[in-house]
Amino acid sequence: MSRPLAALAAALIGLTVTLVGLTVNVHDAEAATEQLPDLRMRRLTNFYIQQASNGDKRLRFTTRIANAGPGRFELHGYRPDTSTARMNIRQRIYNTSGTYRRIEIPRSSTYMFFAGDGHNHWHVHKLQRFEIRRLDANGNEGELKGTGAKTGFCFWDNTTYNLSLPGAPQTAYYTSCGTSRSVNVKMGLSVGWSDKYSASLAYQWIKINGLQDGNYRVRVIADPYNWFSETNDANNGTWTDIRLSGGGTKVTVISSS
């Protein structure tokens, strides 16, 4: 082989090696796919009406927020010192290689705050929304009649949802939401796990003062403003139709989603 041809062959071999190396890197990047969470609200349960000492009528019920996605739902709160009342929030999105990227959530959207309401831990502002609407004779939703009193939510792996989902840990991974002295807080929901807020907990109610007897729809939505990244924003809600009677002293469940 002549010297020019040999040089050309060597160059082509080098180019091939380089291209193969590039191809491997591209494939490695493609293999590391992101695993987003998928937030859902489970069926509402344990409805009852509380007559408060101040005269309010409170419709109480139990909620459960669940993660049915391929990836964990993980939020990190942080503040510079303990004198700062609110924490900024970052969401971590993990991928199949075990690394992650961070998404900064604007403070104007939401934040974490500490609540000494018997829970004594950090909460995400407006992670869920409760509402009640009147139903007409055909079962169609009418105007909004009330919203939930609760504005902050802590969440961790405290009840199982579906441990047969791929990647679901068989034991709880997220177990707390920090203390009043925390400057960094990690809270989350693992794949296949859910967080339960019992009907009796602080602010777990909708005020129903003045509502006439009749049929209503109670709806609860997770991440109602779509601040957080997940696989599907269209399946975040659940509803239950109820009947109020006895001048707002009795509640009966009619049907649920």
For each of these PLM feature ranges, what is it?
Residues 230-257:
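Short beta-strand elements
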Residues 1-12:
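Bacterial N-terminal signal peptides that target proteins for export
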Residues 32-76, 251-255:
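Boundary/junction segments of secreted and surface-exposed precursor proteins
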Residues 130, 211-222:
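A short tyrosine-centered beta-strand micro-motif
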Residues 127-128, 136-212, 250-257:
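Exoplasmic/lumenal beta-rich domain surfaces
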Residues 32-38, 70-76, 138-146, 198-199, ...:
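Beta-sandwich strand segments
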Residues 60-121, 131-139:
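Short amphipathic, basic-aromatic surface patches that mediate peripheral association
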Residues 17-33:
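C-terminal region of N-terminal signal peptides and the immediate post-cleavage residues
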